[in-house]
Amino acid sequence: MKILTILGARPQFIKAGAVSREIAKYNDIKEIIVHTGQHYDSNMSDIFFEELHLPKPDYFLGVNGLNHGAMTGQMMEKIEKVALKEKPDVIMVYGDTNSTLAGAIVGSKLHIPIAHIEAGLRSFNIKMPEEVNRILTDRVVQLIQLRIA
């Protein structure tokens, strides 16, 4: 099994650290990590990967500093290229960022099952970009919706 993990923000790195350590215990599961660059700062990003023993990303997309539409669109283009090349069995997304939404939409369009960590959480404030991302991501997720407490 091949899992394409999409990350872009520091809280996602923290959660992914625990999940990636579990995935690494299984020889028949290969995880490919994609860092979108959404909240990229080399010092902050690198320290999270080192201290959480998270494998270095296989792909760094370098998408940041844009408005929501441009950022999500560029992420979708780049994630789609990676997904078409790697042919994952599952795309795993975390939380409620633009990276989350971009990965979920790509999985949906390419008919790749999506695992969404933190699915179903709501603030009920539709004015928040994160709430829009939560609702849209949950709508396209067909396979797995997980909450990690």
Task: Give the predicted meaning of each segment.
Residues 2, 6, 34, 89-90, 93-94, 117:
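Structural motif
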Residues 112-149:
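Active-site-proximal region of nucleotide-activated glycan assembly enzymes
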Residues 1-38:
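N-terminal subdomain of nucleotide-sugar transferases
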Residues 29-71, 75:
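Conserved nucleotide-sugar phosphate-binding/catalytic loop shared by glycosyltransferases and other
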Residues 92-110:
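An aromatic- and histidine-rich active-site surface loop
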Residues 58, 89, 142:
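Conserved acidic residues
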Residues 83-89:
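Proline-aspartate-enriched helix->loop->beta-strand connector
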